[in-house]
Amino acid sequence: MSTGSSPFVDHKSNNSTISINNNSSILNESSISKAYVSKLEFQLDTIKTENRILQQEKDQITSDYRKIIDEKNQELENLKLNFKYVYDEKNQLESKLTNQEQVSTNNINQLSDEIQTYKRENLKLTKDYNSLLDKFNKLNRKNQQIMHDLNKEIEVNDKLHQELKIKEKTNQELQKASDTAINELEQYSKILDKKNGSDNLLYKNLTTKSNNLQNINHQLQNKIDQLLQNKTSNELLKQQNQSLLHKLQNLENIESKYLQLEIEKLQLETKYNDLFKALDTAIASSNEYKDNENTDDTIHTSKVKSFIEYCNNLQAKNLTLQEKYDSKIIQVKELTKELEDHAREIETDFLPTITDLESKLKVYADQNTKLERTKSLREKEITFLRNSLKQMEQIHANQQHKQQEQEKEENTENKSISQYMTNLEKLVDEYKTKIDELEKKNLEYNKSSIITNEKTPSNKRQRLESNYTFKTQAIELEKENIEISSKLKQAESTIEQLKFKISELDKVETRKEQYRILQLKNNLISQDQFIKQTTLIALRKENEELINKYIKNLPIEEQIPKGVFQRQEDDKQRLQAQIDHLTKRSTRLREVFTKKSKDIITVIAKYFGFIIEFLPNPINPTDLFSRIKLRSRYIPSEEDCYLIIDVENRGLKAHGNFQFKQICEELAQYWVNENNQFPCLLSAVNLKLYEIYASK
């Protein structure tokens, strides 16, 4: 058998492969067609379902629209039914509108009449208000005068108290001196009993003088009692002064209430002006409504109703305001009555006491002059007595010499002389003890002069030992005491002056230290260095924190530096320092401004003749330059006459008596209305016032 392949066999195999391929392609096409058919069927089903849904939606929409059409048809039928009713109502409203227009015109006329009456009442009230203002100003002036008089009386009372203390001290000293003189006179009277007829005459004179001195002492005691009574009366007057001060405080509270009433009055005036404007606009709008009656009836009726309501509200408000105003007038009348009562009380209770005090002061002054005269007379009498005592001592010395010559002849007389000498020695010892007591008292009273007083008794004793009499020593002691007291007073005055100078130096040093501290604080270089140093410290801390966070590999949220906050704080501190510096500068500028403004006002008053004062606006208290008060230098302070210039309203008002107002009106008519020269008006007013008050 051969191994080669036959061609027939090969042909069969090729045909089989072709058939298989054809079958596979047919199968693929059939599957694709089936898939396509299935897709089409699915699409058909979806389209059917969508069509069904759309049909349902269509049915629902048609049903809804049918319902809406039915409802609209019903509404149309209802509107057709209501149209006749509306037409009838329209006719009725038109008739009502005409009636209401007539009523509104009548109401407007009534309101205009009421407005005129209110204006008249307002004018009357303004007149009453001005009269009350004048009364209030008069009462204020009276109160100021009374306060001034009370202060003067208090000062006079204090001076009288001081003078009473001084007089009491002098009276005590005079009593002590008179007691010592009486004791001396009694002792000398014992000695003079043993003398001759010539000595008896001197003794009688001395006794009469001593009796006169005793009478004078009794008179002084009576005067001291009177002064004590006056002291008690002065204390009572002080209590009355305190009660008056309480009453004045109450008057200040009343003044504050009065200012509040003035502010309320101005507010009411503004409200009245607004109401008048509203009425004018309402009347104008009502005229416009009459022109446009046919255009818009419903708007016209609503506006008429609103206007009527507005008028009713206005009437109610006017009634409430009138009640409030009446209550305020009653309060003002009560306050004026209280002020008048206080003024009457002051005039009835305190003016007679003041006159009594003035008369008592005059009496006290006369008494003081009389006391000084009696004091001088007593001093002269004391000197005369001292001289007479010296003469008596000389006579006694001559008699002693005569007795020594007659000792040899009369031994009996020697015994009497020896007794007399022993009595004199005893008197000298008693005087020495009294001198020691007086010296001790002077030492206790004047501690600063201990050394000088310790030296004086030794000198006095030496003088006693060196043939000086007791009376000369007493006179020298009194002179030395007077000199020492004068030196002490001088030393005390110098000490007070030195203390005052030391206190002033301390104040100056404290001010210098404060100024240095302020300079150090406000030094710009030091502030700049301090700010730079703080910023450097903050930047260093920030860099250190950033380096540490970078090394530690912390998350981003924790890597935000805290130095930024510190830098902001430093910026805040710097801004606060700038703010403080600016506030200090502003306060200094204000102080300088006030000083300069005062200087300018004084210069204007000196060279232009008017004292300027800026008054605050009662509506806006912060506005301090809208009103200027001008007071002439030639008007006395007793008369309250001045001019007020209103800068905003360009007005000028004269306040004061009738003569001043008449002068201002005449000069304003000539210089302002005719010549339009306001500065000439001011100079003419000054000249006229100078002519009037210079002639007086």
UniProtKB/Swiss-Prot annotation:
Biological process per Gene Ontology, one example term: attachment of mitotic spindle microtubules to kinetochore
**UniProt keyword Cell division present:** yes
Q: Where is the composition biased (Basic and acidic residues)?
A: 402-413
Gene Ontology, cellular component aspect: kinetochore; mitotic spindle; nuclear envelope
Q: Residue ranges of region Disordered? A: 1-22, 394-415
User: One Pfam family, short name please?
Assistant: MAD
Which UniProt key words apply to this protein? Answer: Cell cycle, Cell division, Mitosis, Nucleus
Query: Nucleus among the record's keywords?
Result: yes
The subcellular location is: Nucleus
Q: Which family does it belong to?
A: Belongs to the MAD1 family.
Q: Please describe what this protein does.
A: Central component of the spindle assembly checkpoint which is a feedback control that prevents cells with incompletely assembled spindles from leaving mitosis.
Record text on subunit structure and interactions: Component of the mitotic checkpoint complex (MCC).
The protein here is known as: Spindle assembly checkpoint component MAD1
The lineage is: Eukaryota, Fungi, Dikarya, Ascomycota, Saccharomycotina
